[in-house]
From Swiss-Prot:
The lineage of its organism: Bacteria, Bacillati, Chloroflexota, Chloroflexia, Chloroflexales. InterPro entries: Ribosomal_uL6-like (IPR000702), Ribosomal_uL6-like_a/b-dom_sf (IPR036789), Ribosomal_uL6_a/b-dom (IPR020040), Ribosomal_uL6_bac-type (IPR019906), Ribosomal_uL6_CS (IPR002358). Residues 151-170 are annotated as: Disordered. One of its GO terms (cellular component) is cytosolic large ribosomal subunit. This is Large ribosomal subunit protein uL6. GO terms for molecular function: rRNA binding; structural constituent of ribosome. The keyword Flavoprotein does not apply. This protein binds to the 23S rRNA, and is important in its secondary structure. It is located near the subunit interface in the base of the L7/L12 stalk, and near the tRNA binding site of the peptidyltransferase center. Keywords: Ribonucleoprotein, Ribosomal protein, RNA-binding, rRNA-binding. HAMAP family: Ribosomal_uL6_B. It comes from Chloroflexus aurantiacus (strain ATCC 29366 / DSM 635 / J-10-fl). It comes from the Bacteria. GO terms for biological process: cytoplasmic translation. Part of the 50S ribosomal subunit. Pfam families: Ribosomal_L6.
């Protein structure tokens, strides 16, 4: 039995979960509405404010889908109540980020600024540098965990951190494996 899959999901007050045809799960909450088509063979039951996920058999596919299905529903419930966020750090001399309306404008050492329009249900928060050497904080915020992660990865891919000085965009919790520079000639 899947340890994650057998845990029930408690639906908080103010959140409405609808399980439709072919396991189309729709979650409405204070921050918005999320809808996702889950595997039709999984058994999703709602009793009051508790949702449970069961699998029809102990086959390899159903075992794999059990925990996944439960986690996807749980992520939707958390997303419409608290939301999801992914923190990034921008390191490098002259690397900047600013918001123009909802558009994120990044100066990353290219000959032009990079403009990123946010997808629906995604917003950006740009922090302040405390000193010139401190990294600049950038946070991607939204209700869909997968979409927040994809958007953060897309921003990071514009200038991934390099191993010599650590310049670039990295996740806040990410550790960069640093390399030593050239040894140089002895004089």
């Amino acid at each position: 039995m899947s340890r994650i899959g057998k845990r029930p999901i408690t639906v908080p007050k103010g959140v409405q979960v609808t399980i439709g045809e072919q396991n189309l799960v729709t979650v409405k909450g204070p921050k918005g509405t999320l809808s996702q088509q889950l595997h039709p063979e999984m058994i999703i039951r709602q009793e009051g404010d508790v949702i449970t996920v069961q699998r029809p058999s102990d086959g390899k596919l159903h075992r794999a889908l059990h925990g996944l299905t439960r986690t996807l529903i749980h992520n939707m419930v958390v997303g419409v109540t608290q939301g999801w966020q992914r923190a990034l750090e921008i390191n490098g001399v002259g690397y900047r980020a600013q918001l123009e309306g909802k558009t994120l404008v990044l100066n990353l050492g290219f000959s032009h600024p990079v403009r990123i329009e946010p997808p629906p249900n995604i917003s950006y928060i740009v922090g302040e540098r405390k000193s010139a050497n401190d990294p600049l904080a950038l946070t991607v915020v939204g209700i869909d965990k997968q979409q927040v992660g994809e958007e953060a990865a897309r921003i990071r891919s514009l200038r991934p951190p390099e191993p010599y000085k650590g310049k670039g965009i990295k996740y806040a919790e990410e550790k960069i494996r640093r390399k030593a520079g050239k040894a140089g000639k002895a004089k």
